[in-house]
Amino acid sequence: MQTKYVPILKWKAGEQNCLKKLSPTVSNAIIPFIEVSTPSESSKDEDAEKKYSKLIHSFNSILPEKPFYLYLTENWYNDLDDANKIPETYKIFLEDIDHPQAIPAFELTDELNISNAPNLRNENGICLRISINSFEHLGEILEQYRNNSWITPE
């Protein structure tokens, strides 16, 4: 069945439970766009590791064999002292979840991550999130990305 709907989810427990309860017909008609925030801050390192581990494993338990768009929110990058570490953060997260159907998603204007997308070892392509603010420049941005060989439209 063709994709008919792309729900934008914050990956909260209620949303995860709803995805598990969808009928196969409905489930096959959607590809979730998941905005992932960092697990809540914890004063204990082991608590933070447990939360991260739970987050990592949730994708394969909730969405086994199902494609989804994976978007890391800005709070993943807030503590980085070097912007060049941003693509590495995304790469590590994608490797940690180890989901064969994950499709990395980036803001259309996120040149740093888009230019580094070939390093993600991902065979599913990427998703470009287009906001209303970048819509009027869509054509020129995509042309620039194509000229730089950052994207290959299909």
Where are these regions (language model features)?
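Alpha/beta catalytic barrel-like cores
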Residues: 1-111
